[in-house]
UniProtKB/Swiss-Prot annotation:
It comes from Danio rerio (Zebrafish). Belongs to the ADIPOR family. It is found in: Cell membrane. It is a multi-pass membrane protein. Its main location: membrane. The chain crosses the membrane at residues 77-97, 111-131, 142-162, 176-196, 245-265, 278-298, 319-339. Keywords: Cell membrane, Developmental protein, Differentiation, Lipid-binding, Membrane, Oogenesis, Receptor, Steroid-binding, Transmembrane, Transmembrane helix. This is Membrane progestin receptor alpha-B. Residues 1-76, 132-141, 197-244, 299-318 are cytoplasmic.
Length: 354
């Protein structure tokens, strides 16, 4: 008996010794990263209004920037909010694929496009905030990729709203132009953001913001119109609105408007410079509410897909295939535009170094 006890104690001692080696192992696996730096230590293009500390030093190797996923810096919250949200979208897709036949049901394709578009914009955004600090050309490249993701999501949202959410009366008003106009405005949004970023050294801050906000605002006004009409119809009827999907659509609009405010205005860091460098930035709040908007939007579309099938089959017929083709066309045009503007940026940076 004593021998058995001693063996158990010996094993515990060995396990304790192994546990002590874990921090050393983690330190070797994740080497100590350079400390973050002040705003004065990074080039102008990396600087954010009213954010003073927490910048990552440029011109490090790629491994460093990937490992900063686990470091505290002023982009950490921005990276993790959209990274975690993109994983939630994958889980949502897996859950929906158990009951929805995305391959053989053409009427499920717009919902698949919405899920793909949401995952794309969230993934591109997470990459931009994680890797853009490496160099000036990396900064422009990854944010242009982010803008392509935004354009893709804008069209994906427009398609889902038009296909599943629209009422018959509104469909009759907009059916001839809604999807082509949504595709054009999505591309215009990408173009405006890319050009605004490219020309930002020569533009006042508010003009740079206008290039981002105005095209996206126009796109949103069109894309959300089926949702607003549906909400109006539901709550203006004589009977109390009992449509659960409409409740989710109301939250979708509310969360988007809150996110748009914090995207447009640098609050609260403007009121407390240096106090919101790591957490509490307006852009971080924008990320959180945009994620909430996307998640309730997907839930609303799921309900509409399930409960309004007779209506959208009657309204759209075999439109889904054309809508998917337009999605691919919009994504390609946006990507080509971003590639062209990146080429202009690269030429500009090379001339600046000479």
């Amino acid at each position: 008996m004593a021998t058995v006890v001693m063996e158990q104690i010996g094993r515990l001692f060995i396990n304790a010794q192994q546990l002590r080696q874990i921090p050393r192992f983690l330190e070797s696996a994740f080497p100590k990263l350079p400390c973050t730096v002040m705003v004065s230590d990074v080039p102008w293009v990396f600087r954010e209004s009213h954010i003073i500390t927490g910048y990552r030093p440029p011109d490090q190797n790629w491994r460093y920037y990937f490992l900063t996923l686990f470091q505290r810096h002023n982009e950490s919250v921005n990276v993790w909010t959209h990274l975690l949200a993109s994983l939630i979208i994958l889980v949502k897709f897996q859950e929906l694929s158990e009951t929805v036949d995305f391959l053989r049901d053409p009427h499920a394709q717009p919902m698949f496009i919405l899920l793909l578009a949401a995952f794309t914009y969230l993934g591109c955004s997470a990459l931009a905030h994680l890797l853009s600090a490496k160099s000036e050309i990396s900064h422009y490249t990854f944010y242009f990729l982010d803008y392509v993701g935004v354009a893709v999501y804008q069209y994906g949202s427009a398609l889902a709203h038009f296909y599943y959410v629209v009422e018959e009366e509104w469909h009759a008003q907009v059916r001839t132009f809604f999807l082509p106009a949504s595709a054009f405005l999505a591309w215009l949004s990408c173009t405006g953001c890319c050009y605004g970023k490219y020309a930002s050294p020569k533009l006042p801050k508010f003009v740079h913001k206008l290039f981002q906000v105005v095209p996206s605002g126009l796109a949103y006004c069109l894309d959300i119109s089926p949702v607003l009409h549906r909400i109006y119809r539901c709550y203006s009827s004589e009977h109390w609105c009992a449509d659960q999907a409409v409740v989710y659509h109301c939250y979708q609009v509310l969360f988007f408007l809150i996110s748009a405010y914090f995207f447009s205005y640098p609050h609260p860091e403007r009121w407390f410079p240096g106090r919101c460098d790591f957490i509490g930035q307006g852009h971080q709040i924008f990320h959180v509410f945009l994620v909430l908007c996307t998640l309730v939007q997907i839930e609303a579309v799921r309900l509409d897909y399930t409960e309004r099938r007779r209506l959208y089959e009657h309204l759209h017929g075999d439109l889904a295939h054309d809508a998917v083709a337009l999605f691919i066309f919009t994504a390609c045009c946006s990507a080509l535009t971003a590639f062209y503007v990146r080429k202009r940026v690269k030429t500009y940076l090379e001339e600046k170094q000479e």
